[in-house]
From Swiss-Prot:
Keywords: Bacterial flagellum biogenesis, Bacterial flagellum protein export, Cell membrane, GTP-binding, Membrane, Nucleotide-binding, Protein transport, Transport. This is Flagellar biosynthesis protein FlhF. Belongs to the GTP-binding SRP family. Necessary for flagellar biosynthesis. May be involved in translocation of the flagellum. One of its GO terms (cellular component) is plasma membrane.
């Protein structure tokens, strides 16, 4: 626990002596300055020295103090054997409150180490605070000495906060998959990857897939997706109007899955987003929106993207370019704090590779400082452990 202090005196050396007597040898000076002292209405004052600093108390002492408090209250209860049940219950309640307060203020080395790792991985301060509260809620002071046990449970807790939807074909109720998102996040390549893994590399059977693009503005966009389609033997249609899109969807009843590639839009271009939403309404009730976001995007910008694309009522988020970022803590924090669900992650440009169905382990493996020795055992623990 850290205690901060400010002391004053005629000279610097005298103040230091005061600090040593009051706070002991562990006291540390942060700043000092000259301040006026005495006088009348600001006149005839003398210059004194004001010193500010802190003292860190050893965790062991904190634990001893907690045990002392237990003994004191228990002795008090014993002395008052004739007290009523209500009085005893009050004493016990007071003990719980006091011990909880002391535990809350203890900065155990295990907690400090875990907080440092989370910050290094770019987790948000709110998320770190939540982890801190989880640790203090789930572990006793003696349990905190077992760093490996606490670390393992923290990793499991983090995994529980990552909500994933599974494959889009696990429960194929909506057969029109529309991918929206800002410019340059890799929507076209992602559409091609999905077409490849479900159209020509299906595990049980390949689906009958069609690709539709409404991106007729970006130079080479139509040619790019058409090339992918030709290589895979999957039909590609370029659409420009609401009527054409509606007719194309109607004429595609024999297809199991229709993948729609859209125009990249700035989340700040509200008018363009509204126009695109109106056009895509032609896909009807069979349509399902998904949002593509680059993992390299700043946290504040990702929040903006989540918010500005909300009119599309997107079901899941696809994080692209995961291979281009060194930290995923900000992504985990965002999907937890903003209650988002992740369906896929991409980590390269190669079609049909470099895409996978998102699962908690996908993100956990990328947390620097945490290692998973047995994936199967870890997944089993995720399913069995419950913190909610």
């Amino acid at each position: 626990m850290v205690q901060y202090f400010t002391e004053k005196g005629p000279t610097y050396n005298e103040v230091i002596e005061i600090i040593k007597k009051k706070y002991g040898k562990n006291a540390r000076v942060m700043t000092y300055k000259t301040v006026p002292h005495g006088g009348i209405l600001g006149l005839f004052s003398k210059d004194w020295v004001e010193v500010s600093g802190y003292v860190r108390y050893d965790i062991g002492n904190q634990q001893i103090n907690v045990e002392d408090e237990k003994r004191k209250i228990l002795q008090s209860i014993k002395r008052e054997e004739n007290s009523s049940i209500e009085d005893v219950l009050k004493e016990v309640k007071s003990l719980k409150t006091e011990l909880a307060h002391k535990k809350e203020n203890i900065n155990h080395p295990t907690i400090t180490k875990i907080e440092d790792i989370l910050r290094e991985n770019d987790f948000s301060e709110n998320y770190i605070k939540d982890i801190n509260e989880f640790i203090k809620r789930e572990f006793s002071l003696s349990d905190l000495d077992d760093y490996e046990r606490v670390r393992e449970d923290v990793v499991l807790y983090i995994a529980k906060t990552i909500k994933c939807s599974g494959s889009i074909i696990d429960n194929l109720k909506k057969r029109v998959f529309i991918l929206v998102g800002p410019t340059g996040v890799g929507k076209t390549t992602t559409i091609a990857k999905l077409a490849a893994i479900y159209g020509i590399n299906g595990e049980s059977k390949s689906l009958n897939i069609k690709i539709i693009t409404i991106d007729n503005y970006r130079i080479g966009a139509k040619k790019q997706i058409q090339t992918y389609g030709d290589i895979m033997g999957i039909p590609v249609r370029a659409i420009e109007s609401f009527k054409d899109l509606k007719d194309e969807i109607t004429d595609s009843k024999d297809f199991d899955l229709i993948l729609v590639d859209t125009i990249g839009k700035s989340p700040k271009d509200f008018m363009k987003l509204a126009e695109m939403k109106e056009l895509l309404n032609a896909c009807g009730r069979d349509a399902e929106f998904h949002l593509a976001v680059s993992s390299t995007t700043k946290t504040s910008d990702v929040k903006e993207i989540f918010h500005q694309f909300s009119p599309f009522n997107y079901k899941t988020v696809i994080f692209t370019k995961v291979d281009e970022t060194t930290c995923v803590g900000n992504l985990i924090s965002l999907i937890y704090e903003m209650k988002k669900v992740v369906s896929y992650v991409t980590d390269g440009q190669i079609v049909p590779h470099n895409i996978s169905v998102a699962e908690p382990l996908t993100f956990i493996r990328r947390i620097n400082g945490y290692r998973i020795s047995d994936d199967a055992e870890f997944i089993k623990k995720i399913k069995s452990k419950s913190y909610y």
